[in-house]
């Protein structure tokens, strides 16, 4: 069962977005700090594939389970189904959410929506939450598109008054209070957590915002 409280502090990471640190250790520190949701996002030039990717996903899924934090897979529906992940998150150019819902009737499904145009072409009735952004410019995602700012978040809340919404894109600890004022249910963080010197402490500070 999906609750919007899960979106409060949503950590997204893979081996290509943790500055060469051990991903398992990074996620463990973030879990100790109090992240509420984790997304395994294994993308980029040096991303793991095949068996390596599968084995790491299983390890991190089990780690998340220990902390009662749902484990979401980015884009890779086959992997999510193979390891019985708690859900998937997809973008506008991936497989349709209506198709995913048929394959994964009881799982969490998240969808990225940037603006009104994307909203109009999205089948939001099939998803549990929407990721909105990028709020600010970001280096973590090559395909993120232009920043939408706080105004973009406010617009998405008007378009989707009842939908659980999580902001993403270039978010630092100092932004969280203002983002929550736009009626977002939480924030998605990549590099501000994974690049932190003390991940556990950084996550605690974020969750206190």
Swiss-Prot record:
Protein name, as recorded: Thiamine-phosphate synthase 1
Secretion signal span: none
Gene Ontology biological process: thiamine biosynthetic process; thiamine diphosphate biosynthetic process
Residues the record lists as binding 4-amino-2-methyl-5-(diphosphooxymethyl)pyrimidine: 39-43, 74, 112, 141
Function, in words: Condenses 4-methyl-5-(beta-hydroxyethyl)thiazole monophosphate (THZ-P) and 2-methyl-4-amino-5-hydroxymethyl pyrimidine pyrophosphate (HMP-PP) to form thiamine monophosphate (TMP).
Family membership: Belongs to the thiamine-phosphate synthase family.
Cofactor binding, note field: Binds 1 Mg(2+) ion per subunit.
GO function terms (MF aspect): magnesium ion binding; thiamine-phosphate diphosphorylase activity
Lineage of origin: Bacteria, Bacillati, Bacillota, Bacilli, Lactobacillales
EC number: 2.5.1.3
Naturally occurring in which organism (per UniProt): Streptococcus pneumoniae (strain ATCC BAA-255 / R6)
């Amino acid at each position: 069962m999906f609750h919007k409280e899960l979106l409060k502090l949503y950590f997204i990471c893979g081996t290509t977005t943790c500055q060469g640190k051990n991903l398992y250790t990074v996620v463990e520190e973030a879990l100790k700090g109090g992240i509420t949701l984790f997304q395994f996002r294994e993308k980029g030039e040096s991303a793991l594939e095949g068996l390596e990717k599968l084995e790491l996903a299983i390890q991190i899924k089990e780690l998340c389970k220990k902390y009662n934090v749902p484990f979401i897979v980015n884009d890779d529906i086959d992997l999510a189904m193979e390891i019985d992940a708690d859900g998937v998150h997809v973008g506008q150019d991936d497989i349709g959410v209506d198709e995913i819902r048929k394959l994964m009737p009881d799982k969490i499904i998240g969808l990225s929506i940037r603006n009104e145009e994307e909203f109009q072409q999205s089948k939001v009735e099939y998803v549990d939450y929407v990721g909105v952004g990028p709020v600010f410019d970001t280096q973590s995602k090559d395909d993120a598109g232009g920043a939408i700012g706080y105004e973009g978040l406010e617009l998405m809340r008007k378009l989707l008054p009842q939908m659980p919404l999580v902001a993403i894109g270039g978010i630092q600890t100092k932004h969280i209070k203002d983002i929550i004022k736009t009626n977002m249910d939480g924030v998605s963080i990549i590099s501000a957590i994974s690049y932190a010197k003390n991940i556990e402490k950084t996550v605690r500070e974020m969750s206190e915002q």
